[in-house]
Each structure stands twice: as structure tokens, then as C-alpha cells.
């Protein structure tokens, strides 16, 4: 079977470009094309600007060349691919270009595609506004309906005529991790098929990415090889930023905290320092909106379920986050269920902090599981399974040695950077559902001038969204529709967290289906952005819409607000 799979590519097609996709370059006037072949071939592009109406030109009069690299898969047959990368430069802002990629000498070309060059700030202001598709966790299987609707977003309802039918302009597709399930499966052939499946979308609009846990195989090699993001040679596509009109888009590597075999604490320190400097450098007059994406979320829509022991002791929701904050009860040090990792962490903190730890007899309240705590506070951890379950502090010798090298830095509070620099929106995947938060910081809902369910006016904290319902074989398609609605109202989520505003597909099980959906973010102006969420289960029905409105940007503590209510009572939970 393995040999049969390896021979499915015929000799005549081995030089044909496959999985063509775009990404933004480091400069505003660039567009990067990436594709693969099964045999070594040239890296050529022929392209030309469209006519006055954007239609196809009479010929593709311009030529460009790029680089090719050999990629040997780590699977049992060491299958070979050639990854081709070409960058078009000096593109006219907002102009539509038509292009083909392939090998000019062999005459092996892809079909003809088009793309729109990045626009100037003035062009975005004139309209149409910047629109970004946001989704994560999309697999080769289970994603047919999602891919169909994404294709319609790009090409209009007549998907058979993807050249001439164009929906309202979509400027980018942003996917925050978990591709194909998995890119390396079947000696990389699952990844090949997935990239081909995404080509009707990603060959027309830039596909900007961040890595998830399903890319972890062999040190994230398939992710690093198949995609090319800005500054990819420095970071292997794991963290970068790019300006697109009014938006400063930042990708970061949430997986660095959970894979000690691939990323050490020195790496996390570099990424953390880079993010701090990058966010500080943003000109919030030129690019008022700061949007961040990664794979693992910082928050949960529901409190962690109580263990039997916790329920018997009075219902205190005790999480490993208690140990991170240094709050503990001496009498409970050796209690059953507290992992040796946590006990070791306690000793480590005592040594690091001079033996000064805050004591607290009883910890109460709701917190998320350790995985979210680790993501929010930036604490290097280890998970027993790739899906993130059973996570705990990573106290292995390699980490501790690395911590000493960076002055005993044992946590990298990424959420603090969001608050410090005024990150407006952060979206993630990992959980196969859709939910959004109220503006939140340090597990507290932070009001602005007016915060309602659908309108966040002058918020004082980052809004977090999980858009991990991209469709994959691990998702359940039940007989009944997903649970949808306001988190805290009657009939909403059991044990809903106070920061959870709206959800779809979180409370699944029995006969209920999970949600299969994607988001579209529109930046109407420097003072308003709107998120719309569409369900592929309901024939593209819009299931949620909400907006952030603020005329003041930058660090939340330094923003000029028109008023300051400052009370949780200002949160409205009715439409």
C-alpha cells in the first residue's frame, strides 16, 4: 500500500505545479507565490496587470524567477518534494494581476490565477474596506462545506466560473493552525491533497498562517517547508507581523510553550522580546488596529469541571493556575492528584523568588484548565498528548538550564503584552467551536464606555475569539443543530465563564452537532471593525455579528475615552 501511494504521481505530471498559494511579502509592493512539484523543475512566473476593469490581459507580458529547495519527508519512504518560492515586486497598489507558475523550459504551467496587490491606506479608506477571513483547524476531511463557502467568498456564487465572478473583496485568509490533519500523514500525501484542495482559495488571496499542535511532527517540518511568511528564514513561519491597510497583523507561536523538544526557553524569550518590541513599534495613527492570532487560546468559555474530590470538598475550582500565582495551602502540599511537576515547580519558585511565596488558605473561583493558563501567562509546559490534555509545568532539566540562562525567567506573560500595547483582537483555534469574549484582562471583564452584547464601545481590554470550527475529521456531525446563543443567559452554557459573550457549538454531545463555521472581519474605518460568523451547517447563515468601536488606539491605559463607567453592571447580555 505504501509503495502504491508513492507511485500515484505519474511521470508526465511530476513537474506540474501543485498547491499554489499566496502570502504577503515583507514589503507592501510584494506578493509571494509558493507551490510544489514532485520532481526538480524551474521556478518561473509569468504575469501581467488586468485591463481597466480588472479583466484578464491579452497576454502575461512580465516574467519572474524564484528559488527551489528539496524537501525530504521524514516518513518511512522518505518521499521527495520540491518547494518553489517566487516573489513579485514593484506591484501597483490595488491593481489586479493575472499569473501562472511553472517551468518555462519544460512548458509545464499551472492554470491562470489572479490576485489583488496590497492597497494603500488611501485606497482602503476609499473602499471597499479591508476584509479578512479568519478560521482554524481545517482538515482534508470534514471541510468540504467550509471550503465551498470560502470559495464563494472569493469568487461569488458561481464557483464554476472562478475567474470572472468576484464577491466583495476579500484581502486575506488567516488560518491559526491545524492544517490537513495532518500535513505529514501518509508520507505527506495528506498534506499534498489538502494544499490542492485549498488552491481555489489560496491561489487568489494571501494565506497567512500560524502553527498548531497538529503541525508538530518532526519539529514542525511540514509547516516550515510548505508555507512562506514574512521573515520566514528567521523564524520558520512561527512568528511575524505584517501591515495590511489599517491593520497590524501579528502571528505568534503558542506551541512554543508546549513542545520542549522543539522549542527551548531561549526561543520563547526571543519571541517574547520580539513581540514586545514589535507591538511597541506600531504607528497607531497609520495602522490603528492591532490583531493577533495563534493556535491555543488564553481563555475558556466554561469553567473547568470539578473533580470528584473538589466537589466533595465544597466545590472549590482549584486549578494548577493557583500554583503559578504562588497561592497554596501548606496543609495540602502532598494532596492526592497534585502532580510531581507542580510540587517541583513549587520548590523551583521558592528557590527563584528567594523562598517568598504568598500563602492562601482557600482558593476559590473559576479559572480555566492549565493549558489556557499556560498560554495566557506564558509558562512553558508539557502535555502528555498532542491535543493539549493533561498539561503541567515543564520542569525538565533542559528547561531549567535554559531558564537560568535568561535570568530565571520562568514565565512570559503574553497577555500582559496585549494589555500594555492595546491589542484590539486576538483569535485562536484548537477548540473545535466558535465563541467570543467580552473585553477581558487577567480573567476580569473590563468595561469601556459602553459594552453590550453586540457592540464593544471604547473597550479597555482585548477581545478574544476562538474560531476553531473549520471542519475536520475529529469533529462530530450530529442529528441536532449546535447549541448557539448568549453564554450566560438561561439555557446558555453550563458553568459559563463571566467573560464568555456568545458561543456556538461549545456544548455539544449526545445528538448535537459541533459547529462548522468561519469568521469574516471587516475594518470599516479607523474607528470601527465588525466580526461576522457564518455557519456552513446552515447554508452560510450568519449566526453572530458584533463590533468594536473606538476612536482611540494604543495602550489601553493611555487611551482617551469619552466616559468611564468602570462597572460590571454595564455589561448587557440581551440583544
Question: Where are each of the predicted segments found?
Answer:
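Cleavable N-terminal signal peptides of Sec/SRP-targeted secreted and luminal proteins
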Residues: 1-8
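Metal-dependent phosphoesterase/phosphodiesterase active-site architecture
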Residues: 8-44, 49-61, 67-73, 80-82, ...
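N-terminal active-site segment of His-dependent metallophosphoesterases
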Residues: 15, 19, 25-32, 37-44, ...
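Hydrophobic core positions of the immunoglobulin-like beta-sandwich fold
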Residues: 88-89
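Residue-level marker for buried hydrophobic side chains located in beta-strands
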Residues: 132-134, 173-175, 209, 292, ...
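Stable alpha-helical elements in mature extracytoplasmic
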Residues: 142-150, 175-176, 190-197, 219, ...
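Short, conserved loop/helix-junction motifs that constitute active-site signature segments
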Residues: 198-204, 457-459
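Active-site HxH/HxHxD metal-binding segment of metal-dependent hydrolases
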Residues: 204-213
Amino acid at each position: 500500500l505504501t509503495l502504491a501511494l508513492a507511485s500515484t504521481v505519474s511521470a508526465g505530471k511530476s513537474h506540474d505545479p501543485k498547491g499554489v498559494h499566496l502570502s504577503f511579502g515583507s514589503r507592501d509592493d510584494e506578493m509571494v507565490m509558493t507551490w510544489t512539484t514532485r520532481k526538480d523543475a524551474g521556478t518561473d512566473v509569468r504575469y501581467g496587470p488586468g485591463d481597466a476593469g480588472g479583466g484578464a490581459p491579452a497576454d502575461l507580458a512580465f516574467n519572474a524567477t524564484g528559488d527551489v529547495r528539496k524537501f525530504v519527508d521524514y516518513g518511512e519512504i522518505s518521499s521527495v518534494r520540491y518547494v518553489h518560492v517566487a516573489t513579485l515586486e514593484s506591484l501597483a497598489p490595488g491593481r489586479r494581476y493575472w499569473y501562472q507558475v511553472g517551468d518555462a523550459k519544460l512548458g509545464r504551467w499551472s492554470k491562470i490565477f489572479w490576485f489583488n496587490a496590497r492597497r494603500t491606506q488611501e485606497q482602503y479608506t476609499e473602499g471597499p474596506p479591508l476584509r479578512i477571513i479568519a478560521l482554524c483547524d481545517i482538515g482534508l476531511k470534514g471541510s468540504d462545506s467550509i471550503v465551498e463557502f470560502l470559495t464563494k467568498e472569493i469568487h461569488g456564487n458561481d464557483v464554476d466560473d472562478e475567474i470572472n465572478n468576484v464577491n466583495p473583496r476579500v484581502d486575506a485568509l488567516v488560518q491559526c493552525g491545524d492544517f490537513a490533519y495532518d500535513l505529514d500523514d501518509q508520507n505527506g500525501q495528506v498534506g499534498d491533497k489538502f494544499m490542492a484542495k485549498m488552491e481555489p482559495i489560496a491561489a487568489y488571496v494571501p494565506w497567512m498562517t500560524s502553527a498548531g499542535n497538529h503541525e508538530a511532527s518532526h519539529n514542525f517540518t511540514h509547516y516550515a517547508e510548505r508555507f512562506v511568511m514574512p521573515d520566514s528564514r528567521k523564524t520558520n513561519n512561527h512568528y511575524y507581523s505584517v501591515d495590511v491597510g489599517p491593520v497590524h497583523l501579528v502571528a505568534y507561536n503558542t506551541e512554543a510553550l508546549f513542545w520542549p523538544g522543539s522549542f527551548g526557553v531561549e526561543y520563547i524569550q526571543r519571541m517574547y522580546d520580539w513581540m514586545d518590541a514589535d507591538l511597541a513599534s506600531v504607528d497607531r495613527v497609520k495602522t490603528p488596529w492591532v490583531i493577533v492570532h495563534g493556535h491555543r487560546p488564553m481563555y475558556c468559555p466554561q469553567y473547568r469541571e470539578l473533580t470528584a474530590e473538589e466537589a466533595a470538598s465544597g466545590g472549590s475550582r482549584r486549578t494548577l493556575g493557583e500554583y503559578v500565582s504562588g497561592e497554596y495551602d501548606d496543609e495540602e502540599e502532598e494532596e492526592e492528584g497534585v502532580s510531581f511537576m507542580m510540587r517541583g515547580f513549587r520548590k523551583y519558585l521558592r528557590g527563584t523568588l528567594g523562598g517568598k511565596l504568598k500563602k492562601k488558605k482557600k482558593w476559590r473561583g473559576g479559572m480555566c484548565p492549565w493549558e489556557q493558563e499556560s498560554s495566557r501567562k506564558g509558562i512553558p509546559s508539557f502535555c502528555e498528548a498532542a491535543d493539549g490534555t493533561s498539561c503541567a509545568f515543564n520542569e525538565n532539566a533542559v528547561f531549567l538550564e535554559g531558564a537560568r540562562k535568561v535570568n530565571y525567567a520562568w514565565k512570559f506573560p503574553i497577555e500582559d503584552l496585549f494589555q500594555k500595547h492595546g491589542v484590539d483582537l486576538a483569535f485562536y483555534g484548537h477548540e473545535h467551536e466558535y465563541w467570543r469574549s467580552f473585553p477581558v484582562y487577567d480573567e476580569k471583564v473590563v468595561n469601556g464606555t459602553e459594552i453590550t452584547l453586540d457592540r464593544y464601545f471604547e473597550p479597555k481590554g482585548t477581545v478574544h475569539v476562538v474560531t476553531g470550527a473549520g471542519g475536520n475529521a475529529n469533529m462530530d456531525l450530529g442529528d441536532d443543530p449546535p447549541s448557539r446563543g448568549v453564554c450566560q443567559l438561561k439555557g446558555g452554557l453550563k458553568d459559563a465563564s463571566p467573560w464568555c459573550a456568545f458561543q456556538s457549538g461549545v456544548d455539544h454531545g449526545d445528538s448535537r452537532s459541533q459547529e462548522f463555521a468561519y469568521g469574516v472581519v471587516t475594518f470599516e474605518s479607523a474607528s470601527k471593525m465588525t466580526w461576522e460568523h457564518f455557519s456552513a451547517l446552515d447554508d452560510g447563515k450568519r449566526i453572530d455579528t458584533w463590533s468594536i468601536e473606538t476612536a482611540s488606539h494604543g495602550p489601553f491605559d493611555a487611551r482617551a475615552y469619552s466616559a468611564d463607567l468602570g462597572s460590571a453592571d454595564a455589561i448587557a447580555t440581551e440583544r
